[in-house]
């Protein structure tokens, strides 16, 4: 009997047409999901700010990387089935396609681990739209969908006998599905959908009026609003954004608004609105979005905080004065108080965000912790407390705003080196107050850096009412001298208020113009001739309400006025 007859493995049936189509479709979707995951993880723009919550901060990166890893593992399983399924089954290893269920289980566990639905919803609700998260979500959905679609053809039968047509058509459909998902994700991540941005033509800004003049317009202001100088007029900030106005006419020129701004989401922090007229720039601070800089004349967007994510500015604060409608420069410090700052001062170009220079190091013998910085339009002042074995002194340095180079220096004996003087900015003038009554030093006020060496040290506290740095003209008030106007720091050219009519003037409700000194009190405006401090009569009534600020802008003098019947208004005056 001849037993040499060979027996072969039973022939397995071919894939059905539907299984072949499903396999091609699932593979194409997987490939598209991995490609979109790579884009999300390495190319897509991330959240402009880093959320404080770890889950929110990590989700976009983690989800994109998960889509890449899980998708690649699934594609490797498909390749293993195509290349060696019959050989592995013949060796007793079973169907390798069954491992796709392990990948599917891992995807489910990863989704639960990252809390994808809830965390993604929180990010969409509280932060500005950005491409990385929606593309990561789309990639993850495509990968999971591809695994589900491919699981049946992988586990049912291990042999393929497809035709070119049965692969090309479903693969094309799968890639089109990926393209639609990508387009939808990019649309969801486009933050421009939520903004209303209108620009204006460039014009030459008019001069600040030389005197008060007459009332020209009234603009209703929201309860939560801030007014700053900017471009050829002024800019009003509200929680929804900013609108720039022409100073001469009071008409709107350009705006940048988020009409759907939410209190717990992205909204404009109007109290932080910062104008830098010397660089024709206005900076806006947005909750959960960061700083955005605009050209104050045209409204063109110049830069955003996210462009500088690699430096330390996001952890620092913009140095600004107290109650000011404009600031002289963009500078970042560790801490700030009423325009006086201490520690790690850095000067930036407001139009580009480029770092220009940093505070010079404190020399030996000077206490770095007691060093103070004050920012004015003409200089950055560094006030140091120094000592050696024989004496103690205070050094005041004037630094050039553009380069940081020293332009003036003054050393003054310090009666108590263990106490640092109070350094602040009053009406764009440097104020150094030692607060040592009956001591050699009391109060130094410097209206311009060129007067640092000659500015007198007062015997008592001096309150600056108004200042013109260009001419070194100061209007001050003190117990010993009363209201005084001094020019260039020279006492022989000082004028004392002849009728004591300025007693109610404070630094927050007065402005020194070319020809007049203006003061506001409650519901009326008073003016004095700058030449001799003689009051013009009669006072200008504003209505029934209260005003406490004067803003001198190009082409207009502005008075925010809280009218008892009409609400908050902005009143414009011009000659």
State each model region's role.
Residues 53-55, 157-160, 196-220, 243-259, ...:
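Surface-exposed loop/turn elements that mediate protein-protein interactions on large endomembrane-trafficking
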Residues 230-231, 238-240, 278-279, 287-289, ...:
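Short loop/turn segments that connect beta-strands within the blades of beta-propeller domains
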Residues 216-231, 259-278, 307-330, 361-378, ...:
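Repeated scaffold domains used in trafficking and secretory/extracellular systems
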Residues 1-106:
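Membrane-anchoring hydrophobic segments
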Residues 235, 283-284, 338, 379-381, ...:
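Structural core positions within WD40/WD-like beta-propeller blades
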Residues 59-62, 98-157:
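Membrane-embedded alpha-helical segments of integral membrane proteins
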Residues 159-193:
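Internal/C-terminal transmembrane anchor helices
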Residues 16, 51-66, 123-140, 209-223:
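Membrane-interface segments at the starts/ends of alpha-helical transmembrane spans
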């Amino acid at each position: 009997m001849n037993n040499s007859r060979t027996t072969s493995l039973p022939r397995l049936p071919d894939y059905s047409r539907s299984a072949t189509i499903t396999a091609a479709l699932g593979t194409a979707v997987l490939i598209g999901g991995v490609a979109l995951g790579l884009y999300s993880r390495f190319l897509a723009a991330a959240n402009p700010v880093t959320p404080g919550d770890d889950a929110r901060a990590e989700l976009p990166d983690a989800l994109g990387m998960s889509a890449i890893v899980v998708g690649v593992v699934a594609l490797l399983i498909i390749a293993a089935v195509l290349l060696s399924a019959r050989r592995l089954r013949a060796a007793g290893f079973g169907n390798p396609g069954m491992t796709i269920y392990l990948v599917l289980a891992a995807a489910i566990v990863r989704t639960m681990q990252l809390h994808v639905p809830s965390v993604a919803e929180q990010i969409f609700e509280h932060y500005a739209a950005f491409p990385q998260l929606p593309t990561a979500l789309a990639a993850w959905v495509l990968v999971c969908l591809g695994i589900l679609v491919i699981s049946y053809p992988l586990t049912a039968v291990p042999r393929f006998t497809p035709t070119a047509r049965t692969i090309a058509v479903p693969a094309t459909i799968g890639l089109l599905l990926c393209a639609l998902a990508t387009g939808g994700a990019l649309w969801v991540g486009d933050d421009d959908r939520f903004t209303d941005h209108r620009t204006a033509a460039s014009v030459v800004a008019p001069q600040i009026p030389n005197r008060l003049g007459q009332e020209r317009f009234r603009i209703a202001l929201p309860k939560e609003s801030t007014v700053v100088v900017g471009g050829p007029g002024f800019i009003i900030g509200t929680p929804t954004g900013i609108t720039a106005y022409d100073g001469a006419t009071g008409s709107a020129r350009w705006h940048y608004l988020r009409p759907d701004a939410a209190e717990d989401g992205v909204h404009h922090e109007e109290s932080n609105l910062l104008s830098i007229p010397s660089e024709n720039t206005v900076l806006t601070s947005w909750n959960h979005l960061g700083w955005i800089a605009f050209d104050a004349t045209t409204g063109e967007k110049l830069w955003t905080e996210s462009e500088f994510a690699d430096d330390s500015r996001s952890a620092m604060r913009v140095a600004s004065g107290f109650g000011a409608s404009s600031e002289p420069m963009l500078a970042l410090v560790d801490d700030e108080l009423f325009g006086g700052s201490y520690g790690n001062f850095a000067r930036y170009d407001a139009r580009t965000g480029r770092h220009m220079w940093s505070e010079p190091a404190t020399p030996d013998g000077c206490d770095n912790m007691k060093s103070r910085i004050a920012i004015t339009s003409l200089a950055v002042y560094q006030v140091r407390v120094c000592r050696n074995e024989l004496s103690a002194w205070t050094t005041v340095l004037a630094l050039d705003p553009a380069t940081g180079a020293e332009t003036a220096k003054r050393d003054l004996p310090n009666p108590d080196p263990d106490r640092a003087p109070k350094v602040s900015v009053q009406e764009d003038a440097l104020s150094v107050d030692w607060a040592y009554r009956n001591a050699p030093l009391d109060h130094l006020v410097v209206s311009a850096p060129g007067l640092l060496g000659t500015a007198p040290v007062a015997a008592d506290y001096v309150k600056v009412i108004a200042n013109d740095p260009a001419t070194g003209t100061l209007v001050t008030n003190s117990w010993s001298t009363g209201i005084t106007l001094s020019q260039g720091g020279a006492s022989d050219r000082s004028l004392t208020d002849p009728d004591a009519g300025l007693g109610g003037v404070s630094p927050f409700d007065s402005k020194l113009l070319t020809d007049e000194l203006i003061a506001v009190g409650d519901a009326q405006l008073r003016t004095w001739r700058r030449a001799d401090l003689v009051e013009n009569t009669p006072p200008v009534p504003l209505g029934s309400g209260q005003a406490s600020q004067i803003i001198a802008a190009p082409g207009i003098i502005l008075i925010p006025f809280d009218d008892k019947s009409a609400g908050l208004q902005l009143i414009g005056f011009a000659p």
